[in-house]
Amino acid sequence: KECTGVLLTVDATYGAIKEAENKGCNLIISHHPIIFTPRKSFLTKDYKCDVIASAYVSGTAIYAAHTNIDGLHDNMAVRTLKAIGAKNVTTLFDNGFGAQGDVDMKFSEIKEKVKKLLCDDTIFTVGDENKKIKKIAMINGAGGDDECFSRAREVGADLYISGEFKHHILLEAKETNYALMSVGHYASEMCFNDVLNDILKCHFDTIKIVKYYEGNPFNG
């Protein structure tokens, strides 16, 4: 079946499927897979099955690019740190995940730059916002776990940014006066659309590409 256009989105939702129909795109490339755990049946009446059924009825294929995109050398975290002015940006892990970069800014200045970049005021911080930051580490999405937090400290980052954090990580950061910034899972991965757009344009210069932004699931 010939591809009539590609819609890029963080999540393949009802809204994304409808937008793909309206814009004449019969392929959706999302970052998050609809199905994370194996299923024996798609006949169950639940949200995930309904979304898949909606795509099927509309003739829309869905492809999820998740871990392979997170591990790119020019991944979402790398792009985010470069966009806020970090220098010497490299990946945080040897396998390509996350990013680290050098800065010379106050914590509060970085916060304002991130808010402007992500167009989202719902950013939460831990630590003294007057603190001078020399090195940032970042992992988009759910990077606020023990392994990622430990890696950020290991490379000498004095600010770690992610989409969401485990409570005990937030508590440890507060108790040790370590700077954290939680920007929201969705907001931290919005640049997925730009990453995929650039990849597709390199290989298919005439393909129609539509970027779809569902928005943060949280109110306010």
State each model region's role.
Residues 1-220:
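Active-site catalytic microenvironments in core metabolic enzymes, especially phosphate/sugar-handling
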